[in-house]
Curated annotation (Swiss-Prot):
Name listed for the protein in its UniProt record: Small ribosomal subunit biogenesis GTPase RsgA
GO biological process entries: ribosomal small subunit biogenesis
Residues bound to GTP: 165-168, 219-227
Keyword terms: Cytoplasm, GTP-binding, Hydrolase, Metal-binding, Nucleotide-binding, Ribosome biogenesis, RNA-binding, rRNA-binding, Zinc
Main function: One of several proteins that assist in the late maturation steps of the functional core of the 30S ribosomal subunit. Helps release RbfA from mature subunits. May play a role in the assembly of ribosomal proteins into the subunit. Circularly permuted GTPase that catalyzes slow GTP hydrolysis, GTPase activity is stimulated by the 30S ribosomal subunit.
Organism: Alcanivorax borkumensis (strain ATCC 700651 / DSM 11573 / NCIMB 13689 / SK2)
Major localization class: cytoplasm
Residues reported to bind Zn(2+): 301, 306, 308, 314
Gene name for this UniProt entry: rsgA
């Protein structure tokens, strides 16, 4: 379903209401800080491990080893930018019972964002080192959708690994298609892991990929992200959904973003399922840089302002004709480029 388009007056009205709410929250926060300052301990480092609306869960980062980890529910100052799971913060624990307070955010190494319902950028996870792009035989994988995740990873500076889940569903009919799709991405340098979460088969490569990194699973609903987390971290016991018999799409089962620690080292951020994935505020030049093999070739085009569509001497077209790049990837680039609207925001729904 298309997103609601707002006129200038409606956007001004929404921004005015939001500004008034922020002002009221800031005044309340100033009063609360005066009242509770004496009840808080010394400032210390921490990491946001969960977000619950007006409160967050903070894990203390002071002291080495898992035995020193403690978590505490906290308020956060209204003057802070939006907190997300994975944020490294400065916080003050309560001296007795009660809630702590997050007082500052440390600089982010990376931030993963997506547009909200008004088209504004909204961070969903911070300090992610690796994006695990999950796909499965069902719902039927789309290279165009996979490319969207990979472009997002490239532009965010996050390493990407593709994870083919539900390998037990691959029959003789599906195998050639799945192998061709996987080989296309392996040829580009993206690792592709083939696993089966329900049977715990082939999870060793996934454990190795997760070790020592902060990772996030992405992918359309129904591909088994929660099942994979249960496979590598059984005590997480995340709810698992079935595919809808009507749409063939999965049902969203994760309702709160959360950071969990893995026995082999590293952290995993599980965030609510994303059925619609937009490429935020980008133009065609940015989109081009999200395609690593196309970006390398673009400088060899005959014309500096080449649109890579039908100009003579276009290096991308020549490379596709010569078999040096995959025609499917170039077609996906064209498709995504065509969906970029005039203000640079792309709209795409995996429901379609």
């Amino acid at each position: 379903m298309a997103k609601r388009k707002l006129n200038r007056r409606q956007r001004w009205r929404i921004e005015k209401i939001q500004a008034e709410k922020r002002d009221r929250a800031n005044r309340r926060t100033d009063q609360q800080e005066i009242l509770v300052a004496d009840d808080l301990g010394d400032e210390q480092h921490g990491v946001i491990t969960a977000h619950f609306g007006q409160q967050v869960e903070v894990e203390s980062a002071d002291g080495p080893g898992a035995e020193n980890r403690t978590t505490r529910r906290c308020h956060f100052r209204a003057t802070l930018e939006q907190l997300v799971v994975g944020d490294k913060v400065i916080w003050q624990p309560p001296k007795s019972e009660g809630l702590g307070v997050v007082v500052a955010i440390e600089p982010r190494d990376t931030v993963l964002k997506r547009p909200d319902m008004y088209g504004n950028l909204k961070p969903v996870a911070a300090n992610v080192e690796q994006m695990l792009v999950v796909f499965a035989p069902l719902p039927t994988p789309s290279s165009s959708l996979l490319d969207r995740y990979l472009v997002a990873a490239e532009l965010s500076g996050i390493a990407a690994t593709l994870v083919l889940n539900k390998a037990d569903l691959i029959d003789d009919t599906l195998r050639p298609f799945v192998d061709e799709l996987s080989d296309m991405y392996r040829h580009l340098g993206y690792p592709v892991l083939e696993v089966c979460a329900h049977q715990r088969e082939g999870l060793t490569p996934l454990h190795e990929a997760l070790a020592g990194k902060t990772s996030v699973f992405v992918g359309q609903s129904g591909v088994g992200k929660s099942s994979l987390i249960n496979g590598v971290l059984p005590e997480a016991d995340l709810q698992v959904g079935e595919l809808s018999s009507n749409s063939g799409l999965g049902q969203h089962t994760t309702v709160t973003a959360r950071l969990v620690h893995l026995p082999t080292g590293g952290q995993l951020i599980d965030s609510p399922g994303i059925r619609e994935f937009g490429l935020w505020h980008i133009g065609e030049d940015d989109l081009l840089h999200g395609y690593r093999e196309l970006s390398e070739l673009a400088g060899y085009c005959k014309f500096r302002n080449c649109s890579h569509r039908n100009e003579p001497g276009c290096a991308l077209i020549l490379a596709a004709q010569n078999g040096d790049i995959d025609e499917e990837r170039l077609a996906n680039f064209y498709q995504i480029s065509d969906t970029l609207n005039e203000d640079g925001r792309e709209r795409y729904s995996t429901d379609s």
